[in-house]
Amino acid sequence: MIILPSITEVQVESVVFPPAVKPPGSDKTFFLGGAGVRGLEIEGKFIKFTAIGVYLENDAVTSLAAKWKGKTAEEVADSGDFFAEIVTGPFEKFTKVTTILPLTGQQYSEKVVENCVAYWKAIGKFTDAEDEATKKFLQVFKNEMFHPGASILFTQSPQGSLTISFSKDGSIPEKENAIIENKQLSEAVLESIIGKKGVSPSAKQSLAARLSDLLKQCESTT
């Protein structure tokens, strides 16, 4: 088992992402890879909707080190392959999306599905299975309301499951709300955040800076 150097928390607006969390239904503790804001330019003003933290299980460090050890933050930030490897790598990921402005479950889920479908069509992988998975995804969110400080939690398994949980106060619940078995959806949700057209460039920058530094620290301790 790899022993990680000291991992720090990240604050995004008023939201603090702790250095380590244990996802709902998991016996593993994940470390904070990076965090950032998701917003949109509306009438010349940048409106912030959510703060997003991306956590990884410890095995991610060993997996990423093979190709990215010794690379600078700028080198990994500019590489689409780096983020693709986080999305598709053989390790678990946990994403915490905390609302800054109120959002309905329908608003949030429809936008996520729109981004996922656009990604699948771009890579030629939109099948009936993905269509069915998005319908399940929309159903899970249908009656939810996320007030400021509430969180949407995703656990992405390399085996292909997407675990969805909700928290009204930003804490980590013990149990999940739903599990959807579809590898393409599991990966596409994270891809929509940190991928080529990801909705949170600041989370990508944070991941690049923190992980490149972490890989350097791990290299110096081995």
Curated annotation (Swiss-Prot):
This is Chalcone--flavanone isomerase. Keywords: Flavonoid biosynthesis, Isomerase. The record marks 108 as: Important for catalytic activity. One of its GO terms (molecular function) is chalcone isomerase activity. It comes from Verbena hybrida. GO terms for biological process: flavonoid biosynthetic process. InterPro entries: CFI, Chalcone_isomerase, Chalcone_isomerase_3-sand, Chalcone_isomerase_bundle_sf, Chalcone_isomerase_sf. Belongs to the chalcone isomerase family. Part of the biosynthetic pathway for all classes of flavonoids, a large class of secondary plant metabolites, many of which are brightly colored. Catalyzes the intramolecular cyclization of bicyclic chalcones into tricyclic (S)-flavanones. Responsible for the isomerization of 4,2',4',6'-tetrahydroxychalcone (also termed chalcone) into naringenin. It is an enzyme of class 5 (isomerase).
